[in-house]
């Protein structure tokens, strides 16, 4: 799969609303977190095959000119499925809570709410063991269900 074939997947839901963003969805990340290091990218110009071991940013966003913007960004590692299918998948490397204060839950459907809650469960599970009690209180609150 090449990046230009993946890019429309990230833009799908915005496009359904007549919206888009003017940047690529993702770019290569190299040694010492060197950003915009190719050849891999997920964008309309991404013609490089995505291969196992490549690290790519995943950063869809939306910007309403002179009003606001949002971008949720993680780094992802391309990995091979362990099922002899020769398929690849992305494993999220950078895990941080999405700020729930910035989410308009009334605009989300049940699947979107479930995705955010599942993501936050993963964040908590992966980070909590490295935190002391004060930080753990913050992480627990930040990763709790968005509909409380």
Specify the residue positions occupied by each region the protein language model found.
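Gly/Pro-rich turn-and-neighbor structural signature
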Residues: 1-26, 48
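Charged, cofactor-coupling segments
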Residues: 24, 32-148
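Active-site His/Glu-centered metal-binding helix of metallohydrolases
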Residues: 29
